[in-house]
């Protein structure tokens, strides 16, 4: 009922052979996620990698299989799964459980490396202060449609749950760095969402306007680090609003995208503050993209983020396309993560190939970050990457299987 191009992407992270694997399953603009009951069959393989050419920051990557069956049991029970090498995220959705306009979801997620933390200050990736994290949790969601029968759906979303996070050092963590204690975290989130976007790579059409608020309670706060020089706050509040549009002229192969996100917070720490940087579009439900920057390079209390892209064809058939994009953010940094300039921006380009059957898409891309601090305090960050999506549903329709 609700999906109508509403997306759900939870960001999770896994360290495999020195590469950060991001399991993009539900929203992690603020740790937990808001999924929605999806009425479409989906079988998607998503891969993405972003590699910095200057500096040694965290490398963003994701790899997962996305499965959705809207009628797994009868006609009113749906199952969504996102499966990565060491992490699983899913939700059972019960359509019209309480009323014809009310859906209910039971979410579950967990595995290894989903709570990793990467310390980046002033462009310096501090491996000795970074560590691995594991855990999982459960969540309950209610999705209430406010305008049944209207072309563009307006939904109220309420979600609450509990997760547990445990931490351990990796091969680079300093022996003198005291790790944070394992802890349970409770959370509640509420939001108002108009329309939404599909959970696919660069959708042709999409519209969303939404506003959200979240409260997190850490049931085991305290201090950690070098001589207990940093702490975990007992509670944090997050607020954000988003507006985005994707529109394509499919007959000529041109496409535009615009998005703006504004975020604020109260009593946040390193684990709950906003993180900006990187370019992978499926890294989060509301990706705070900055081309040329490391993944999660900037840590903020509040921000204003702007993004735009333009795509045009290269030759007949629209199989090859060239992509131009730019992003900027006005940032109020978390204490200890300040940089000389509150304005950060980057530009990027990419070459896209989509076959006639549109069962897969490949994107080769480059990004440059104007204010990214690199070696010796110089500014300017470069990155290259690749994105890949394979749609098994389209393949099966083409082959008749």
Predicted segment positions?
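Hydrophobic, lipid-facing positions within transmembrane beta-strands of outer-membrane proteins
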Residues: 59-63, 88-92, 134-140, 186-192, ...
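Bacterial N-terminal signal peptides
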Residues: 17-29
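Outer-membrane beta-barrel initiation region
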Residues: 2, 31-110, 116-117, 183-205, ...
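Membrane-embedded beta-strand positions of outer-membrane beta-barrel proteins
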Residues: 45-47, 77-81, 106-110, 154-160, ...
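Outer-membrane beta-barrel domain signature
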Residues: 50-54, 77-82, 125-131, 145-149, ...
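Transmembrane beta-strands of outer-membrane beta-barrel pores
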Residues: 49-55, 67-69, 81-87, 108-116, ...
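C-terminal outer-membrane beta-barrel translocator/porin domains of Gram-negative envelope proteins
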Residues: 33-42, 185-340, 372-401
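Outer-membrane beta-barrel translocator/channel fold
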Residues: 107-149, 169, 360-385
